[in-house]
A protein has these predicted regions:
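Alpha-helical transmembrane segments of multipass membrane proteins
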Residues: 17-21, 60, 64, 153-157, ...
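Membrane-interface interhelical connector segments
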Residues: 30-47, 94-103, 107
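Terminal transmembrane helical module of multi-pass membrane proteins
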Residues: 125-165
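Interfacial helix-loop-helix junctions of multi-pass membrane proteins
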Residues: 98-116, 158-165
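Interfacial helix-start motif at the membrane-water boundary
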Residues: 44-67
Length: 165
């Protein structure tokens, strides 16, 4: 199934971008500056609800899922959606990667599980978009799989982020 293959490729690309961002921070020796910019304290994470975390993440993924549906009706929308979706994924994973480079193992312990689930959720939504972009018939089953996977992964990620893994 090409949707599963695409989701795997998007996940791999996201992981690669995050690693590159982390390496850039470490190689340039700007960990302190990046930590000052983020202002995070891994020893005392912020207190937000799982609903808040889920709502923030689902908005981003919804753009890809709705984009997949929209492309069936208006194929030229890809000229607008392609750069938006690419930028959303790239910016999010680069920010996470830079933070991991700056904070190292303490932050990695806090975010590893839920960040990977969030990336996989974005990849599932992105896979639906890529499927529609190639003008392959986006079956209702494939779209439903992507939507259910996205929502399920984001729910699990939100619970892990708030209550710890």
């Amino acid at each position: 199934m090409s949707v599963v293959r695409d989701a795997g490729r998007i996940t791999a690309a996201g992981l690669l971008l995050a690693v590159v961002a982390a390496l850039v921070v470490v190689v340039l020796g700007v960990e302190h500056d990046v930590r000052a910019w983020y202002g995070l304290h891994p020893s005392s994470p912020s207190r937000v609800s799982a609903t808040h975390v889920f709502a923030n993440n689902i908005r981003t993924c919804a753009i890809a899922l709705l984009g997949a549906v929209n492309l069936r009706l208006w194929p030229r929308a890809r000229w607008l959606l392609d750069p938006i979706l690419a930028a959303l994924l790239a910016i999010n994973v680069l920010l996470v990667g830079a933070a991991l480079g700056a904070y190292g193992t303490p932050l990695l312990r806090l975010v590893a599980a839920h960040a990977l689930l969030e990336l996989m959720a974005a990849a599932a939504a992105g896979a639906a978009y890529l499927h529609a972009r190639r003008r392959e018939p986006l079956s209702l089953a494939a779209l439903a799989w992507c939507a259910v996977a996205t929502v399920g992964l984001l729910l699990l990620a939100a619970v892990l982020e708030v209550h710890g893994a």
